[in-house]
């Protein structure tokens, strides 16, 4: 018997992200993961600014998702964001 594919949920992050936004962002995404029990979360990052705070936010979301048995996968990431993730050593942590 083949294992079924994990349930997928999607969400988007937009705008510049301030450090003060990180706790609320994590709370909202964790609530979504708890409601859906998804195994994969597709995060549309096409509307974000590629900077260190954004990478910090994405890394925190991945950690929170893993605590819920989920994996965040990036969607519509810019080359600039992918390059920054690679530079910071997090490219494998946040797959697309």
Where on the chain are the PLM-derived regions?
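STAS-like cytosolic regulatory interaction modules
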Residues: 1-53, 60-96
């Amino acid at each position: 018997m083949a294992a079924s594919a994990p349930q997928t949920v999607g969400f988007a992050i937009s705008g510049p992200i301030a450090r003060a936004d990180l706790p609320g962002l994590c709370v909202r995404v964790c609530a979504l993961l708890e409601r859906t029990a998804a195994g994969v979360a597709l995060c549309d990052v096409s509307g974000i600014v590629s900077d260190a705070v954004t990478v910090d936010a994405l890394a925190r979301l991945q950690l929170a998702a893993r605590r819920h048995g989920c994996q965040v996968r990036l969607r519509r990431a810019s080359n600039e964001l992918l390059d920054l993730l690679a530079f910071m050593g997090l490219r494998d942590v946040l797959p697309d």
